[in-house]
C-alpha cells in the first residue's frame, strides 16, 4: 500500500519517456534561449543536466520585445519603493524547487502545485491524460509541502513551461480522497488546484481518479470493503457514494463508471505489488474483471469500422507521420471519454427539467441507409386542400381527429421524406417542412394499425366504407406513436386536424417500414424491461446485447451484431424515447436504458431544437406543392370581389403593417396571441375553474385626471364680455387669448402633462373661477392607435371621448387643427364622399411631404366602457353654456346606496319601494353546491336568482354610515319548482314561483335587480322559447318545512301590473327596459313586412340568424346568398318568400354592381365577371340594388382567419379569409341602415386581432356607428355552450342597438375583448353566479321525443306524447308530425361500446370495462379504444369521448358531424344506445320543430352546426327592434 504521500505508486508510466532528437533539428543552448526573439518555426530543446536522457522539448515562449522607447521619469523617494504583490518568477524548475524547500530533503523532492495548467510545446492547454500520448509541460505556482497553501501563497514560486511530465500517479486510497501526482525529472508534484481556465480539463481526470478510490474502498477488506460484490451492486454503491460527497458538482452515472472500467482496473492492479499476502488480488477479482470487460465491450461497440484503405494518410503527396495503431486508438478513446464526461456534467447542471426545453433532432444522414433511394411523389388529380374541411373554431387543443388512408409524405420539392424527421413533441422549433397527401375520412373509432390492411380493421357501416376524400395537407407539426396489444398506430397533426394513418401508398410503404420497425422494437424493449424484477436492472448495454439475441423471425429483429444494433437504436432514438415517455409506468420511463439512450443521442452532437412554451397555430396559406402541381381542384379558387374603398383600406394596411415587421403593433398583441391559443369553443373544464376565481367586475369607466405642467404667463386675457354664468356662479366666456393663440369654443388645444406627453382637448366651455383663475373645461381626444383599433387606425384619426379635464388657460401649448367631420349619409353620396376623401388624403400627403403640421379628423365618439363608437353629438358640443353632455351622462358609483324614506331607497341607480319584487343572489340562501366536473354537466348545481317581495327597509341605527352590506331589508321569499326537485322543475313553467311564509332579513348588497310577480293571466306569452321580460306568476303556496304544495289562499293578493305606476318598474339591473319589452311577443311575428327592415342575409346557411331576427318582428329577409346547395335549399323551405341565390357571393356582388352601372368601382377577378355575365335576366331582376336593402347580416366563413394572411397568392383557405372583404363590400355598396356581423368567438383574436380591428376600422371609415362584443348562447335559453362574436353597425342618425341581457344561468366566464392600457370590455357579465331564470337542460330540450334506434332513418314520425317542459311546448308549437328524428349509424364496435357505456351522468370511455369483444366477423378487439389510455395525459384524458349526455346538464358545442371519437365526443343519448339525432341537435340550437333541413344526414348536421341559434338571434333582434322603434317614436 501507499504509505508516504511523497512516494505515490506510479501507475501511469508513459510508454516512451522522451523522443530522440532528429539530426536536422536546431539545437539551442540556454544562453541563446535568453538572448532575444526566437524563430517561431523552429523546435526548441532544453538540455538535460548530467544525465543521458535525450533532450526534451521546451515550450515556446513569447519573444521579448527589444525596441522599447525610453523616457526619463523622476520618482520621489516614496514612489521609488515598490511593494511586490506577486510571487517570485523562476525560469528553471530546479531553482523553483530549491526556493520552496522547507528543510533538509533526503528523498526525492515533493512539492504542491496550485493554479496549474498542462500544455503542449505550443502552449495550448491539453487534457491531463493526454500526457500519455505526447510531451506535456507544466505552468504553475510551486508551493512547499505546507498545509495552509492559500494563507502562505507568498512562499510559492511561479514557473512556466517546466517539465516535461514523465509520469503520473494516484494516491489517497486509504483516506478516501483521490490525490493526483505528476512527476518530472526534478521532483514529484501533488496537484492541488488547477487554474480557472484549466479546471474543466482537469476535473474529468480527477473524477476518474475518485472513481478508482471509491471502487478500491468498496472492494478492499483493509478499509471495510467487500470483494464479493456483484457488478450492479458495485456500480450503485460507487455512484451513490460519489454523488453524496459534499461539494461534488453534477451527477455521476453508472455509464460513466462502466466507460472507465479499464482505467479503474489498470490503476487497482498496480496496488497488488504492495498488497499484503492475505489480501485479495485485484487482478483476478471477478467484479473488477467484469467492470473491465464491460468497458471493453463498449469500446468494441463503438468501433464501427469505416472503409479506409491501408497505409498512411497523404495530403498533396506529402505523407503524414505514422502513428501507431495503439496510440491512435487510445487517443480516440480518451477524446470520446472527454466528450462523454462533458455531456454528463452538462446534464447534471441542467437537471432533468431542461430536457423539456430541447428536442434532439434525428440526423437524416445517419438514417439514410435504412431508407430507399430518393423518389418523388406525384399528386392525384382529385386532391383538395385540407383547409376546405377546417372546422370553424378548431384550435390546437381541440382539432378534430380523422383517418388518412393511402397516404404519403414529402417535402416542398415533392421528394418522399421519412416521418421521423418531424419532431415528435408539440412546440419543437422545426427546421424541416413535411407535407402529406391521402384519402381523408372522419374517425369512426375503428381499430386498425398503421399499414395494416383495411380488411382487418373493424369496419364501420356502409356509409363509411368509401375511401374518403383525396386531400393534400398543410405542414405536419408533430406526430405520435400509440400502441396497445399488437397494434401500432401513427397519428400526425397539422394545424387543421389529427390524422390517424392507415395504409400508406405502395410507393411510400418502404419509407414507412423503418418507423414501424423501430416502434415494434420499442414495444419489445418495454416488454423486456417489464419482465425484470426492476426496470433499471438492465443497463443500456445490457438491452443492446439482448436485442442482438432476438430471433431473425421477430418483427423487432435488427441484427445479431451488437454494434449495428446500438447504431440503429441510437439513430432512431427519438421514436423509442417518445414511446417510453408516453408509457404509464414511471419505472419504465426512468429506466437506465432510457437515460442511457438519451445520453448516447446527446453524444452524437445532433441538432437540438428549441421547445416553445405554447403551441402556436399558424394557419396561413397552404404551401403544399400539390396545390400547384396537380390539375385544378374541384372547388374553384376565386379572390374576393370588393369595392375600391374596402380594397384600399385593407391593402394599405397590409402594405404598411406586415405582422413580422410591425414596430407599432398594439400593446395587447402579445396577450392576444396567448388568448388566441387559449380560446377554445369546447372549454368546459377550463371555464369551470375560471368561474370560481374570476371577478365579474369590469374595468370601471375611466375618469383620468392629468397633472399638468403649469407655466406662468402674463399674456392671457379674455376677449369680450362674459356670456353667462355656470350653475355655481362663475363667469363664462366665448373667446380667450393665450399669448398669440386665439382660443375659441369648439377648438382643440394641446397640453403637456408631467411626463411630457401631449394631450389634446376639445374646448367645451371656458370660465373664470371666483379666485380669478382662467379655466377651460375640455374633453380628451384619443388617437386611433390608442383605441381598440390599434394600428388599423389612420394616423390622422382622432376620437372624442367622455373623459373630461379642467385646466388653466396658461397650460395650453398650442392649437391643433381638428376637423369634426360630418358627411352626408347614404348610398347616393358614396361617390361624392369618396372623391372628397381622395382630395383630402392627397392634401394630407402633400402637407406631410412639406413637413407641415398634421390636420386631424374626428368622426366618432369612442366609448370603451360600452365597447362602441358613436356618432358625434354635434348639437351638444362646444356650446359654452357651462354644461357638458359627457359629465351629465356619467353615472354615480354603481354601488352607492341612498335611503329616500322608510319605504324606499336607491341602490345601483334603481329605486326600490316596499311591495316591489326583486332578485336576491342565490348564495345568500345557501352555499353553492359542489358541481360535477364531468364534461357536459357544467350547469348542474347553478342556481338562478331568488325572487323576493320587499316588505320593509331597516335604516342603520344612530349616525352609523349607510353601507349596502350593513343596511338590511325584510323580504318574503318565493320558491321555484327547481328548489323542490329537478323532476318538478321539468314539468313546470320556467316562470312559475311559489308563495311562502319564509321572511328573512337580507343585506342590500345582495340585491340584483327588480322583477314582477303577477297572476298567470296577466303575463305576456310568446311562441318563442326566449325570455325577455322579468315576469313571474304565482298560483301555489309552498311550505319548505313539510314540502307541502297547496293552492294559493284567496286572501293572498298579488299586485297586478295595472296597480303599478306606469314605467315605475321598467328598470332592471341598471338598464331601462323599453315599453316594447312588455308587449306580447305574438305581436312581433304579426308586424307587417312594410314595417320590418328589408334584409339581405349573406352566408345565410340554413337560416338560423334570419329565423331569430324575423321572430323578433324586426326584419324580413327578402334576399339570401348561400354557396352550398343543401343549405340554400333548406333556407328556401323555411323562408319561401325570400329570393335565395345559391352562388358565390363574389359573383353576385359583381352582378349587382354591373347592373347598377358601377363596374368602375368594382374590383373583381375575370372569373367572377364571366360568371356574373352568365346570370339569367330573371336572376338579375331579382338582385337587390342600393336603396332597397335596410339591413345586412351574416357570418362570413372563418376557417381562414387564423394565420398570417398578407394579400399574396394563396389557395382556398385565403379566399375564405377574404370573404370578410366581400361581406364588408356589400355593406359599403348598399349602405344599409343596420349591419350585423356574426362569427366565432376567436374572430376578435385571429391574426393577432388584425382582422377584427380592420373590420371595425372599415365600418367607421364608411361612417357607421359600431359596437362589438361576445355573447354566450347558453345564457339566452338554449341548452348548449356556444360563444359568438358580433359586430353591430348603425348608420348616423340611427340608434346603435345595445346587447341583450343574459337571462339564464350558465357556467361560462365573462367573455372579454382586450383593449389598450390593460383594460377589457365584456358585452355581458357571467351568469354563473345567478340569473333571472334557470338553465335549460338536456331533458327540457329532448325529453319528450320518441325512442329511436341506432341508424334510425325514417324522416317522419309521430310524437307519441304531449310536450312536458316549458321549452318543449314552445319549441314544438303547433307541429303535428316530427321530422328529421334520424340518427347516424355507428359501426358494430362503436355500437357495442355505446351499449356498454353506463347510463348515468358523465360516463364516457373511462367507464368501459377493460376487456375484448368478438365482432360478427370473428375478430377479437379491445372494448376500450386502445389508443386512448396511452395518450390520455396529452389530451386532457380524452374527456367526453364516447360520452353520454347528462339529462340535467347541457349539450356541448354543436358540431357539424357528431362522432363518438370526434372533437366534442359527447354525442350519446342519455339513456338510448345511439348518437343524438338531427332533430335533437336542432333543438339544442333552438330551431323550432317545424324547421326543415335538406340533403343527406351529414348535410343536415352540418347546417345545424354552422347556424346561429335562433333564440340568440331573437334576443339580438329584440334589441334591434328597440333601436328602430326609438327612432320612430
UniProtKB/Swiss-Prot annotation:
Keyword check for Cell wall biogenesis/degradation, yes or no.
no
Question: Which catalytic residues are annotated?
Answer: 1198
Compositional bias (Acidic residues): 674-694
Ranges of residues in domain BAH:
741-873, 910-1049
Q: Which Pfam families match?
A: BAH (PF01426), DNA_methylase (PF00145), DNMT1-RFD (PF12047)
Catalytic activity reads: a 2'-deoxycytidine in DNA + S-adenosyl-L-methionine = a 5-methyl-2'-deoxycytidine in DNA + S-adenosyl-L-homocysteine + H(+)
Q: Recall the GO molecular function terms of this protein's record.
A: chromatin binding; DNA (cytosine-5-)-methyltransferase activity; DNA binding
Start-end of Basic and acidic residues biased regions? 21-35
Q: Which SUPFAM superfamilies match?
A: S-adenosyl-L-methionine-dependent methyltransferases (SSF53335)
Q: Which residues form the SAM-dependent MTase C5-type domain?
A: 1093-1527
**EC number(s) on record?**
2.1.1.37
Matching PROSITE patterns, A to Z?
BAH, C5_MTASE_1, C5_MTASE_2, SAM_MT_C5
In its keyword annotation, does this UniProt entry include Transferase? yes
GO biological process terms, semicolon-separated: DNA methylation-dependent constitutive heterochromatin formation; embryo development ending in seed dormancy; genomic imprinting; methylation; negative regulation of gene expression via chromosomal CpG island methylation
Coiled-coil positions = none
Summarize the record's disruption phenotype note.
Answer: Non-viable and shrunk seeds, and embryonic lethality when homozygous.
Induction (record text): Induced by salt stress, cold stress and drought stress.
Family indicated by similarity: Belongs to the class I-like SAM-binding methyltransferase superfamily. C5-methyltransferase family.
PANTHER family, alphabetically? CYTOSINE-SPECIFIC METHYLTRANSFERASE, DNA (CYTOSINE-5)-METHYLTRANSFERASE 1
Q: What is this protein called?
A: DNA (cytosine-5)-methyltransferase 1B
* Source species of the chain: Oryza sativa subsp. japonica (Rice)
Q: Which gene encodes it?
A: MET1B
